[in-house]
Amino acid sequence: MIIKRSRKELRKIRHLRIRKKIIGTSERPRLAVYKSLRYIYAQIIDDTKGHTLVSASSLEKEIRSQLKSTKNIEAAKLVGEVIAKRALEKGIKKVVFDRGGFLYHGKVKALADSARAAGLEF
């Protein structure tokens, strides 16, 4: 019997396949992106220590107050700018981008482009 896998399950499989290849170090941590139906999240992670160095999401009050909606491309752009600003304050300039199994399109692309424009290199 063939069972069709859900989109969520297929995304998780893609993410595991990507994570085998992408590793964040202290010199070049990993910028991980996750999006739910309502919010978008970004974290900068040092995988060697297992620590989250910087995070930002459209769930935060300071970001949410500037937005009309937390689930559109504008929210992703703002989260990208905020994560880049916080990373630069901590001295992080270069990162490895982890799209989390999501297609590099729409909100994920908007977050990446705005983080690049704000000064992160990847």
Swiss-Prot record:
What's a GO biological-process term for it? translation
The cross-references to Gene3D superfamilies, in alphabetical order and at most eight, read: 3.30.420.100
Alphabetized, the UniProt keywords read:
Ribonucleoprotein, Ribosomal protein, RNA-binding, rRNA-binding
- Name-wise, this protein is Large ribosomal subunit protein uL18
What interactions and quaternary structure are annotated? Part of the 50S ribosomal subunit; part of the 5S rRNA/L5/L18/L25 subcomplex. Contacts the 5S and 23S rRNAs.
What does the function comment of this entry state? This is one of the proteins that bind and probably mediate the attachment of the 5S RNA into the large ribosomal subunit, where it forms part of the central protuberance.
Q: Which GO terms describe its molecular function?
A: 5S rRNA binding; structural constituent of ribosome
Write out the GO cellular component annotations. cytosolic large ribosomal subunit
Gene symbol of the encoding locus: rplR
- State whether keyword Transferase applies: no
The record's section on CDD domains has: Ribosomal_L18_L5e
Its family remark reads:
Belongs to the universal ribosomal protein uL18 family.
The family database entries (InterPro entries) matched by this protein are listed as: Ribosomal_uL18_bac-type, Ribosomal_uL18_bac/euk
* Organism, as annotated: Dictyoglomus thermophilum (strain ATCC 35947 / DSM 3960 / H-6-12)
Q: Which HAMAP family match?
A: Ribosomal_uL18_B
